[in-house]
Structures are given as C-alpha cells and as structure tokens.
Swiss-Prot record:
Disulfide bonds: none annotated. This is Crystallin J1A. One of its GO terms (molecular function) is structural constituent of eye lens. The keyword Protein biosynthesis does not apply. Keywords: Eye lens protein. InterPro entries: ADP-ribosylglycohydrolase, Ribosyl_crysJ1, Ribosyl_crysJ1_sf. It holds the Pfam family ADP_ribosyl_GH. It comes from Tripedalia cystophora (Jellyfish). Belongs to the ADP-ribosylglycohydrolase family. J1 crystallin subfamily.
C-alpha cells in the first residue's frame, strides 16, 4: 500500500470516529432497549436524530459526546505539538474539561436531564490528580473511554513501533486500570492494521494472534465471532453500558458484520445503550478500511466542528511517524 493511501486511511479513521460519535449522541445512553429498538429498527436514517432522547443531558445536535470530546482534545494536541507530549497533553486535558469550562457544571442524577455536556465521574476524579502532576492520574476502573478516545494517536503513530507505550500513557491519564490499557492497545493494533494495509478479512485473527497472551483475548474473540446474533442482541448479551469488556465486545461484534461505514454506524446507533464510544471505535475501524470517501459529506457538515476535524485530520496525516 502506498504512503498516500495510508495517509488517507489515517485521516478517514479520525474523521470517521468523530462524525460517528456526533451522529449518535442524540440517542446516547438510552437503556430502554425494547422501546428504543422498536422505534429505530425501521428508521432508515437514525443518525443526528432530531428528537433528543438522551435522558441524562441535553446538548446541541452535531456536538460530541464526552467520548468524542476526549478524542478531539487528543487530536488537537497532537497537531499543535506535532506529536505526543504527556505533560502538554495533561495540561490540555485539564484546561478543556477542568474548572471554569462547560464541563465543570453541577450534575446530579436527581436532576436529569442536565442542560449542557456531561462529564463522567472518573474524569472528574482524574482532574484532581492531574492538577497535582500525577502522570498516572486516572481512576482505577475499566471504562470504554480507553479505546474510544485514542484514534488520533493511532493515526499518527501507526507503524512506528511506539504505539503501545503512547496508548498506555494516554489511557492512564484518565483510567489507571490494566484492562482499560490492554483494551485500548488491542483496539489500536487492529486500527493500525487497517490504516497500514487496508481491508483485510483476516485482520482480526492476525492481530489477535500477535497480541501478547492475556486473560482478555478470549472475551474479544468470543464477541467478534458471535455471528448468529444481531448487533442489537449482542449488545444486550455482552452489556449495553459503558464498562469493559462489554462495551468493547459490542463494537467488535459490529465491525465483523462486513458493513460499509454508513450501515455500521447506523447499526451501532440502533443498538442503544452506551453507543457513542462504540460508534467512535466502529467509525474508526470501518472508515480506515474504506478511506475518506466513505464518510458522507452531509454527515460531516452536520457535525458542529466537521470542517475543523477534517482540517486537523489532514494535517495529522502528513505528520505520521512511520
């Protein structure tokens, strides 16, 4: 594969991840599966849903969820610094989500939905440690932020040999948890394969076989090959919430359906629950296989920072460290 093709796939992964997140957010965190699926299974265009169904917070259509927003912060950091710098990334993260920002607003499950963006509790706790300079400031929980936010890092460092180390550093800023790190590293290796080699039906098997043996591989393999289930049923089976391994298993199951970008994102939307991080992952994996032309231009235009992320992704793709 030519260098230009790899750069386009890196760009596609970034844009595909963030656009998928924005397309999903109006129906993020809807856990009444029966009602939700009945309403959406026959809806031909569930993306950017005009009715905001998220029961936890209200925000503008086309904006990013907390998962996409972390992805965006990392993207901006990498472009502005021409690479990853842990201290500068921690500073940028704190400035974006910390005191005085739109995310630093009272939120209580007794008063829902909140008006404005949501900040997960483990992020709030991590911010307190970031301020002290702790490089492993994250909370010890296994959460889906780990893989949902790192696509720009993979796009920049695919093929460099530095990916595992940088992924661990980024993840432990918010999630100082081994399962979170290993999940993110596997997500990164699979995305790296797609960026460097394009479509490959054997990609998952190859990456899994080359991944160091640990206790999580069977969980990923089980979900990926669970072809008898629809993605909606797989999400119910493995877990529709934000925790790992279930959230990641739902994303793996979806990417093995061999659907195009639009169909994959729509499938993820219709499966409900904590679907924004799954959309981030699926959007990156699928867009990296098909290239930037697979992402509908009208989806990009409906994303509030669509043009900005395209420009950042273009700049980052020219800085790939391979």
């Amino acid at each position: 594969m030519s260098s230009d093709q790899a750069k386009d796939r890196a760009k596609a992964a970034i844009v595909g991840s963030l656009v998928a997140d924005a397309a999903t957010q109006p129906v993020h965190w809807v856990y009444d599966h029966n009602r939700f699926y009945e309403n959406f299974r026959n809806k031909s265009e569930p993306e950017f849903n005009s009715e905001w169904l998220n029961p936890y917070y209200r925000y503008d259509n086309g904006t990013f969820s907390i998962y996409g927003e972390q992805n965006y912060v990392l993207l901006k950091h990498l472009v502005e610094n021409k690479g990853f710098n842990l201290k500068k990334y921690m500073d940028a993260y704190y400035r974006h989500f910390g005191p005085g920002t739109n995310y630093d607003q009272p939120q209580s499950r007794d008063r829902l939905p909140k008006q404005g963006p949501w900040r997960n509790e483990h992020i709030t706790r991590a911010l307190n440690k970031i301020q002290s300079g702790d490089q492993r400031s994250g909370t010890d929980v296994a959460e889906c932020d780990s893989y949902a936010m790192i696509t720009p890092l993979v796009a920049m460092y695919a093929g460099s040999g530095q990916l595992d180390s940088y992924v661990e550093q980024v993840v432990r800023v918010t999630l100082n948890n081994d399962r979170s790190v290993r999940t993110a590293q596997f997500f990164a290796k699979l995305l790296e394969h797609y960026i460097l080699h394009g479509r490959d039906p054997e990609a998952f098997r190859k990456v899994l076989n080359n991944f160091p043996d640990d206790q999580y591989k069977f969980e990923w393999q089980k979900a990926y090959y669970d072809r008898d289930l629809s993605n909606n049923d797989a999400v119910r089976k493995y877990g529709s919430g934000c925790g790992l391994p279930g959230n990641f298993q739902g994303a793996l199951h979806c990417v093995n359906r061999n659907e195009d970008y639009v169909s994959s994102v729509r499938t993820t939307i219709r499966s409900g629950g904590c679907n924004c991080p799954r959309a981030c992952g699926v959007g990156a994996w699928v867009a990296a296989q098909y290239g930037s032309q697979c992402i509908p231009s009208n989806w990009i235009s409906r994303t509030s920072r669509g043009n900005e992320i395209v420009q950042y992704a273009e700049q980052l793709s020219k800085m790939m460290k391979k």
